[in-house]
Amino acid sequence: MSTIKIEKKSQLVKEVFDSVASRYDTMNDIMSLGMHRLWKDKMVNSVHFTKNSKVLDVAGGTGDIAIRVVRKEPSAKVTVCDINQNMLNRGRDKAINSNQINFDWVCASAESLPFEDSEFDYCTIAFGIRNVSDRKKALNEAHRVLKPHGKFICLEFAPMHYQNEIFTKLYDLYSFKVIPKIGSIVAKDKSSYEYLVRSIREFPTQADFKMEIEEVGFKNVEFHNMSYGIVALHIGTK
């Protein structure tokens, strides 16, 4: 299994999401058997969003998290930021179809956010942090734009480490054989889904990622596994 080189990752990620944008939601449903919707629900429901709070959703082009936030707290002011304009376009269309027209949509990198220091009360990122080229820089930026006591909420796939050899082999078979095949059939793009699988496998463990979040200054960092550790929710406070 080849490692994704950092210097090439940014362009690769852009190409991947340019390719899959139009079928991204469909593929998520197929690959996760619809579970991604439950994981996102649990992510948003785990946080008490205060009235009139400012929320930044990074790598949020699909609009999934933003829509859930305003359904939970209608007074929230949500900014959706994504490096990929095609994903933002899809998210904007979805938001309009959900009668959500008051979001701000910003095309920018998680590693260089075009916002003031201490501007937001909450910073969310779902299934996006593993795709940034420089994770520490992205975490520093999230910390910078949050107000004191602001919350960082991150939902991400976790590398699977099971002692059960049979389960591990089945998971690897599904990840490296079935998912790319589905990508080839449904999205006509096998290589993009091979990348997505590799990016999960190369992501740090839950405990190691917790330490990375702490290293940029977040306090009271905790994580909660979902679906037996397939995904994890990390929450930290500035």
From Swiss-Prot:
EC number(s) recorded for this UniProt protein: 2.1.1.163, 2.1.1.201
Residue sites binding S-adenosyl-L-methionine per the record: 62, 82
Keyword check for DNA damage: no
One Pfam short name: Ubie_methyltran
Pathway membership, UniProt: Quinol/quinone metabolism; menaquinone biosynthesis; menaquinol from 1,4-dihydroxy-2-naphthoate: step 2/2; Cofactor biosynthesis; ubiquinone biosynthesis
One of the GO biological process terms: aerobic respiration
Key word Hydrolase present: no
Alphabetized UniProt keyword annotations: Menaquinone biosynthesis, Methyltransferase, S-adenosyl-L-methionine, Transferase, Ubiquinone biosynthesis
GO molecular function terms listed in the Swiss-Prot or TrEMBL record: 2-methoxy-6-polyprenyl-1,4-benzoquinol methyltransferase activity; demethylmenaquinone methyltransferase activity
Annotated catalysed reactions: a 2-demethylmenaquinol + S-adenosyl-L-methionine = a menaquinol + S-adenosyl-L-homocysteine + H(+); a 2-methoxy-6-(all-trans-polyprenyl)benzene-1,4-diol + S-adenosyl-L-methionine = a 5-methoxy-2-methyl-3-(all-trans-polyprenyl)benzene-1,4-diol + S-adenosyl-L-homocysteine + H(+)
SUPFAM superfamilies, A to Z: S-adenosyl-L-methionine-dependent methyltransferases
HAMAP family documented for this protein: MenG_UbiE_methyltr (MF_01813)
Protein name: Ubiquinone/menaquinone biosynthesis C-methyltransferase UbiE
Organism: Wolbachia pipientis wMel
Gene, per the UniProt record: ubiE
